[in-house]
Amino acid sequence: MPNLLLELRSEEIPARMQRKAAGDLKKLVTDALVEAGLSYEGAREYWTPRRLALDIHGLTARSADVREERKGPRTDANEKAIEGFLRGAGLSSISEAQVVNDPKKGDFYVAVISKPGRATEEIVAEVMPGIIRDFPWPKSMRWGKASSAPGALRWVRPLQSIVCTFGPEHEETTVIPFEIDGITASNITYGHRFHAPEAIMVRRFDDYAASLERAKVILDAERRKDIILHDARDIAFANGLELVEDEGLLEEVSGLVEWPQVLMGSFEEDYLSIPSEIIRLTIKTNQKCFVTRKQGEDTLSNRFILVSNIEASDGGKEIVHGNGKVVRARLSDALHFWKRDQGNLPDLETLAASAAKFGLDLQKPLDQRMAKLDALDVTFHAKLGTQGARVARIRALAQKLAAVTGADAALTDRAAVLAKADLRTEAVGEFPELQGLMGRKYAALQGENASVAAAIEDHYKPQGPSDRVPEDKVAITLALADKLDTLTGFWAIDEKPTGSKDPFALRRAALGVVRILLERGIRLPLLATTRDGDLLSFFHDRLKVYLRDQGARHDLIDAVLTPEADDLLMVARRVEALTAFITSEDGKNLLAGTKRATQLLAAEEKKGTVIADGVSPALFKLDAEKELFAAISSASKDAANAVAGEDFRSAMEALSKLRGPVDRFFEDVLVNDEDAAIRANRLALLRLIREATGTVADFSKISG
């Protein structure tokens, strides 16, 4: 079957946009072809810094013929209805319609519309200009003389050429020469900008990819990544070092080069006095280079690895030299930041009021930065006040939470006061992603308690489902205070996540609270802390996500979770106990019996029957009734006591004793007895079953 090759070649596409853009191109083109009546066997997208490419194989040569019958009005309908039918069906005269007889409804018109299939070339030429014009780039530009004209083409960078060929795998292909803003699709592409800028004629994907590789362009981004990673590891190993791998940087660098050449540079060892995180970010952010370390050690070396797009005749010496100069200049700046952050600020006399407010020691550099943060009235959020006000709120909340977590109150207070101080450091100003980490380092340098220093870094954690949860009690307390303050604040100003939009990462903050409470075994009544039922519901949503990710069944979570449940740890423990019980033989049988009882009660309640609150033993006629009543009385008491003692497994064990009596009751007893009093008493007995199991879960919500 025929294949379609498409290439959109432009000036350099930002690396961060390439993967998604290639995926968008694949989806837009294949969706349009399918909508036009074509089918295909497979499609794969490719990208380099200068091109998006698409290979669609097994594409049908033309769309199928379509025959459609469109029912019209009755033959005796008024003229207006008939005219509307003709317009809608595309008929010029009613004589072109067929008459169909319906014995019940009478004769009516039917238009038979036949649409012949279309050649794939025609369809592609029709859909591609619109796809290119409306392409969903996050940012795009106009260029050239035509850029000022209305409707001028916009692209991420100036679009230079288009390749579009179609044909069978082993035969000659044809060019589909659609045109857009003066660019006509052809079978001509170009290789590497510097090594092979000459025109290359291509036919289909196989020779296209091979021709590009001969022209120093590796089309497959995953291959470029593999080459970079393999060569970087090798060059590091050859120098007695190991590569510090970075998947994000690898993805970015592979989007900067079409012909990757891996080289090694160096800088003076004096710069290794800078924290390794700063060195790594400086080299990564500014030069897109990898750092290395001694084999088997955490300490960085003074060698870095860069990836060039040019196979230089001098083996890359000039490229390494140029990159080294820039790296050294950047590290010199970083060293300057690092040293300045450890020194005194020049305007200490203006910080006295802020220092007094937070109990700060202006002889210490980090304290000075916190005082400066407050004195400058740095805004946290327009509706939530300054960073200083935020720290004051976190500080007050942390003191309350310390009583729950068992954290040392004095250490918690000190950590809360210094938690945001590094926001005024030059290192964090240059690299915002180092907030918390730099605070920890500066805190250690000025002699803070280890728990305080750790809490300054860890109060931002966890920052996602795979991030670690704080372990130190002070860090746990501060992490909870920070996240709860953020959530209650944004809820108070009605800035809540909507759909896929969550600009303030509130879902992540709520999941962080859930993980801390559950993974560190903390009992915290959230309503007493947040005083917001809607926010509690938001926590419930995050709890459900977390528990499902841990393997819990959604129906068991729903069976346990009530709208007012604000102790999330207890909810999780109930779900755990219920899971173990409901998968046991006793649990399965009790569930079946309870569901039967619940269904009978629901049917009666739907009819308006009022179920009695109490049961009269005097009305028991059968031993099965007496046995069930006694079992419920005992199990209910034991289960309630176990729940009160938060021993949910024992509560389930107590309920398991109901299995036999419930089974025998339904085997031996007819609930709908002819005697109305006995019938009502038996319904009341069923109600006791529902109430007994309800002490631990709503069994009606459990599937099975």
UniProtKB/Swiss-Prot annotation:
Entry EC no(s)? 6.1.1.14
Name where it's found.
Answer: Cytoplasm
Keywords, sorted A to Z: Aminoacyl-tRNA synthetase, ATP-binding, Cytoplasm, Ligase, Nucleotide-binding, Protein biosynthesis
Highest taxon of the lineage? Bacteria
Q: Which GO terms describe its molecular function?
A: arginine-tRNA ligase activity; ATP binding; glycine-tRNA ligase activity
Q: Which organism is it from?
A: Rhizobium etli (strain ATCC 51251 / DSM 11541 / JCM 21823 / NBRC 15573 / CFN 42)
- Listed PROSITE patterns: AA_TRNA_LIGASE_II_GLYAB
Q: Which GO terms describe its biological process?
A: arginyl-tRNA aminoacylation; glycyl-tRNA aminoacylation
RNA-binding is among the record's keywords: no
Q: What is this protein called?
A: Glycine--tRNA ligase beta subunit
Alphabetical list of InterPro entries matching this protein:
DALR_anticod-bd, Gly-tRNA-synth_bsu, Gly-tRNA-synth_heterodimer
Pfam families named in the record: DALR_1, tRNA_synt_2f
Family note: Belongs to the class-II aminoacyl-tRNA synthetase family.
What's the encoding gene here?
glyS
What is its quaternary makeup? Tetramer of two alpha and two beta subunits.
Q: What class of enzyme is it?
A: ligase
The record lists the catalysed reaction(s) as: tRNA(Gly) + glycine + ATP = glycyl-tRNA(Gly) + AMP + diphosphate
Quote a single Gene Ontology cellular component term. Answer: cytosol
Q: What is its main location?
A: cytoplasm
